[in-house]
């Protein structure tokens, strides 16, 4: 785009958002500005632009602008547009998952649970945690120290003897009254102290209890409390960092770059406990400055996730507008800090070291994947190999048939392009017909709309499935995609697969062939994606059919029963009185349900 001085002069000196648009109308880049005229004009005055920006400017046809009241409002609009439009030259962080929490339920004997979503009012949630592993690790540690139950309420209410967790000293067995309500409530209260970061107060409390027991010559209790103190010390050593006052809750965001790979590491500290780390890798981040990547992450990530009162960052960023926006989003004052001392400086160094390790691993993986892709391309004698699609079929004796399609593009699996297909209208258990139907579903619209076709199409199966795939592609007029079946062979052992071409030719690659490893990776991912979809569909169908086949039970009552008892097994375990206690279930209907399930 050449410089249009009249256009630049017409821009207001107000905050707002600008969009770089190409000749086809596609938005290439979205940015925000405190002063639109200055910011947009800077693109045409600077001579030291990054290669990424120079490439973008060559494609820009025109620039659209939107004026906002404040810079913070511009920042919010910018990031909403980036998430919605996904412009090619913006740094984009994808993070669609909600964060998990550790839950203490509001039951008379509260249980520890892993949870995502909005907790019920009577439950207490602690977190968020960066990943499910961190929650489960915390639950295991709390079980060791406080022996709180983790079983579902339906299981708890129907036990007649302690489970294995009691035998290995991970649960005090309140289900069969091996612990008093008062003692269990005290254990819950102490666990909550630990989760809230009051570990010092908890240690002092248990120490006082131990000393009191020893003075009363209750040496058994004193020894038990001594062991609890030791386990608590282990937990503190493993999860706690040195914190004081309001600094006990913070996120630490650090960025690093290795071999062209940028990684952002998010470290979560809640109640003085280091809950864990999570790494993020931006799309379109090539050539971006570290501060630019970090600012993009903070702005995009916290639009959809809980915001702590303090965020420590490893790079200096333009934090004024960002701080205002985050404070408005959180409904409280949020502080962004870069230049810090003492323990907070140590936290940033720790997060930065983790970011560097993540970038190093991703860089090594990328090099390895590039080698695999090149080896497979050369072996199959393909001019280009950028996109691979793989299909798999999953069912149980013909029930709940699901076809999966996974995509490998560039040097990684492209999960946004994954698809599952419900296969109906075929003979149950007919894998050949299922494969034919799946391919027709996948490529019918692609052909009509002139969409993207893969360079290589993998079919998890032998000659029969390959023949069906050939037939389906022929029906659609597709003849420029290399088709390859991946047959497991008689022994079905990994590493002994045979590759089958569309014309029936067979190819066996060495077990250590890099290209063969790539095929296995994509095939295994297709299998995983198919089987998880199949299990979900099968489980849903079985629950629906089991309850809805009972006279008087429709979708609404089925939902009430499942929510009340925590699942179908809980409904099965419930007696007539328990069933009749559910809203909308009369005693007569409860007896019908009980008899139908037994």
From Swiss-Prot:
Keywords of this entry: Cytoplasm, DNA damage, DNA excision, DNA repair, Excision nuclease, SOS response
SUPFAM superfamilies hit by this protein: C-terminal UvrC-binding domain of UvrB (SSF46600), GIY-YIG endonuclease (SSF82771), RuvA domain 2-like (SSF47781)
Protein location: Cytoplasm
Pfam family, one: GIY-YIG
CDD domains: GIY-YIG_UvrC_Cho (cd10434)
UniProt key word Metal-binding: no
InterPro entries: GIY-YIG_endonuc (IPR000305), GIY-YIG_endonuc_sf (IPR035901), GIY-YIG_UvrC_Cho (IPR047296), Hlx-hairpin-Hlx_DNA-bd_motif (IPR003583), RuvA_2-like (IPR010994), UVR_dom (IPR001943), UVR_dom_sf (IPR036876), UvrABC_protein_C (IPR050066)
SS bond list: none
GO MF entries: DNA binding; excinuclease ABC activity
SMART domains given in the database record: GIYc, HhH1
Function text: The UvrABC repair system catalyzes the recognition and processing of DNA lesions. UvrC both incises the 5' and 3' sides of the lesion. The N-terminal half is responsible for the 3' incision and the C-terminal half is responsible for the 5' incision.
Family: Belongs to the UvrC family.
Name of this protein: UvrABC system protein C
Species, as recorded: Thiobacillus denitrificans (strain ATCC 25259 / T1)
């Amino acid at each position: 785009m050449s410089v249009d001085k009249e256009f630049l002069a017409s821009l207001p000196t107000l905050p707002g958002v600008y969009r770089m648009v190409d000749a086809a109308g596609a938005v290439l880049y979205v940015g925000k500005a405190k002063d639109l005229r200055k910011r947009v004009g800077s693109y045409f005055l600077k001579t030291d632009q990054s290669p990424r920006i120079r490439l973008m400017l060559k494609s820009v046809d025109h620039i659209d602008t939107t004026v906002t009241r404040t810079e913070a409002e511009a920042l919010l609009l910018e990031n909403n547009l980036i998430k919605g439009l996904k412009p090619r030259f913006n740094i984009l962080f994808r993070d669609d998952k909600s964060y998990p929490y550790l839950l203490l339920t509001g039951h008379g004997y509260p249980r520890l649970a892993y949870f995502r979503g909005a907790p019920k009012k009577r439950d207490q949630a602690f977190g968020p945690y960066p990943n499910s592993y961190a929650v489960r690790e915390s639950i295991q540690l709390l079980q060791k120290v406080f022996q709180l139950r983790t079983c579902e309420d339906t299981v708890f209410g129907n036990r007649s003897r302690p489970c294995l967790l009691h035998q290995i000293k991970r649960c005090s067995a309140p289900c069969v009254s091996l612990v008093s309500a008062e003692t269990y409530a005290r254990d819950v209260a102490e666990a909550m102290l630990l989760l809230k970061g009051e570990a010092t107060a908890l240690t002092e409390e248990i120490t006082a209890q131990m000393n009191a027991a020893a003075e009363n010559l209750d040496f058994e209790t004193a020894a038990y409390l001594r062991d609890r103190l030791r386990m608590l010390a282990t937990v503190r050593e493993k999860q706690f960092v040195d914190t004081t006052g309001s600094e006990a809750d913070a996120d630490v965001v650090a960025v690093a770059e290795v071999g062209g790979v940028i990684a952002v590491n998010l470290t979560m500290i809640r109640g003085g406990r280091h809950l864990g780390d999570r790494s993020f890798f931006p799309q379109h981040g090539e050539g971006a400055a570290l501060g630019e990547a970090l600012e993009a992450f903070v702005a995009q990530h916290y639009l959809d996730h809980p915001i702590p009162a303090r965020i420590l960052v490893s790079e200096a960023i333009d934090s004024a507008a960002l701080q205002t926006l985050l404070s408005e989003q959180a409904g409280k004052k949020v502080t962004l800090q870069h230049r810090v001392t003492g323990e907070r400086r140590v936290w940033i160094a720790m997060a930065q070291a983790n970011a560097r390790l993540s970038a190093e691993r991703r860089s090594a993986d990328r090099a390895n994947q590039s080698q695999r892709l090149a080896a497979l391309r050369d072996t199959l004698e393909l001019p280009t190999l950028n996109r691979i699609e793989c299909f798999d079929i999953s069912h149980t004796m013909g029930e709940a048939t699901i076809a999966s399609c996974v995509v490998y593009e560039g040097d990684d699996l492209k999960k946004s392009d994954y698809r599952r297909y419900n296969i109906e209208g075929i003979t149950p258990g007919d894998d050949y017909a299922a494969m034919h139907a799946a391919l027709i579903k996948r490529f019918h619209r692609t052909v009509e709309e002139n969409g993207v076709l893969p360079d290589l199409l993998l079919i998890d199966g032998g000659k029969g499935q390959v023949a069906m795939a050939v037939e389906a592609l022929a029906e659609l007029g597709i003849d420029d995609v290399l088709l390859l079946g991946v047959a497991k062979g008689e022994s079905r052992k990994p590493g002994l697969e045979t590759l089958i071409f569309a014309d029936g030719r067979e190819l066996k690659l060495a077990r250590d062939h890099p290209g063969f490893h790539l095929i296995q990776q994509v095939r295994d991912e297709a299998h995983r994606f198919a089987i998880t979809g199949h299990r979900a569909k099968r489980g849903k169908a079985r629950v629906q059919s089991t309850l809805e086949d009972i006279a008087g039970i429709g979708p609404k009552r089925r939902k009430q029963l499942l929510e009340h008892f925590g699942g179908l097994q809980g409904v099965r375990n419930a007696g007539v009185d328990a069933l009749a206690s559910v809203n909308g279930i009369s005693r007569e209907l409860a007896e019908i349900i009980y008899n139908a399930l037994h």
